[in-house]
Amino acid sequence: MPESDLEELPGVGPATAEKLRDNGFDAFQSLAVANSAELSNTADIGESTAADVIQAAREAADVGGFETGATVLERREQIGKLTWNIPEVDDLLGGGVETQSITEVYGEFGAGKSQVTHQLAVNVQLPTEYGGLHGRAVFIDSEDTFRPERIDDMVRGLSDETLQAAMEAHEIEGSTDDEDTLTELVDAFLDKIHVAKGFNSNHQMLLAEKAKEIASEHEDGDWPVRMLTVDSLTAHFRAEYVGRGELADRQQKLNKHLHDLEKVGNLYNAAVLVTNQVQSNPDAFFGDPTKPIGGNILGHKSTFRMYLRKSKNDKRIVKLVDAPNLADGEAVMRVQDEGLKPE
């Protein structure tokens, strides 16, 4: 939407509109999903005025009312599926990682969580006919896990046919056998991954707002943001809020953070991928005692929950633990130098 539209809302003059735009509220859709307290603080207006602005934005953007199931089905046809390039895992997910949803991948150290985030940051840039979304990725790195060298490995590890398609998508001419051409292609992939290191939970939450700005900036471009990754979602929250006395505060902040991530996914048709740490449940006498951090809040906010665990050598077991429309199941993949590969 044009920025000038904001001034058409009741209670929004030029000065207020400028404050809203400076804080990432540059379209009716972003205002429509805000809450009145957040908007009141951002624009320095009363909460009742903020509520009126939000309601007007919802009406203008046609957001927040009831819809028929047929309308919801039609809208869901716009949702993209991002491939893992592992048929077993893609089948498990009904075609791949969904846009407009939060997918949580949890597992112990070394299970391959960060490998998944790197591989999907590559795959999202592939043409849609090769399982990609022809989009860029935003990567919030809270554990210093992002390695451009790993992106290099994974791009070079694509099949020749996929490499050729990627070269066409990135408008690079040459042969897949030519080293200079491959280097140029790797650089093109890296240029479309926006990385920021989160130093603490507050900074991590701020970066989610910055991610929204990046998505807005590229919304109408040739390479829109189609994936937002947080690796790891819970590390800072777990370290900073210790003990039962601080659990409520931690969960409240985590809920706000997840809500912000969810908004980016919904507004910009992006897949939201978060990794999560685990802990052992000493009360579990049977089965796997490993459970994810984050409690019920993360459990409810994650549309898809996936559990990675180590197997022999480079094998990893990928288990779909929870999904609204899919049966639980398991698949096997390999973590190799060239990236994630089928068994």
UniProtKB/Swiss-Prot annotation:
InterPro entries: AAA+_ATPase, DNA_recomb/repair_Rad51_C, DNA_recomb/repair_RadA, DNA_recomb/repair_RecA-like, DNA_repair_Rad51/TF_NusA_a-hlx, Hlx-hairpin-Hlx_DNA-bd_motif, P-loop_NTPase, RecA_ATP-bd. One of its GO terms (biological process) is DNA repair. Keywords: ATP-binding, DNA damage, DNA recombination, DNA-binding, Nucleotide-binding. One of its GO terms (molecular function) is damaged DNA binding. Transmembrane segments: none annotated. ATP binds at G107, E108, F109, G110, A111, G112, K113, S114. Disulfide bonds: none annotated. The keyword tRNA-binding does not apply. CDD domains: archRadA. PROSITE patterns: RECA_2 (PS50162), RECA_3 (PS50163). SUPFAM superfamilies: P-loop containing nucleoside triphosphate hydrolases, Rad51 N-terminal domain-like. Belongs to the eukaryotic RecA-like protein family. Involved in DNA repair and in homologous recombination. Binds and assemble on single-stranded DNA to form a nucleoprotein filament. Hydrolyzes ATP in a ssDNA-dependent manner and promotes DNA strand exchange between homologous DNA molecules. This is DNA repair and recombination protein RadA.
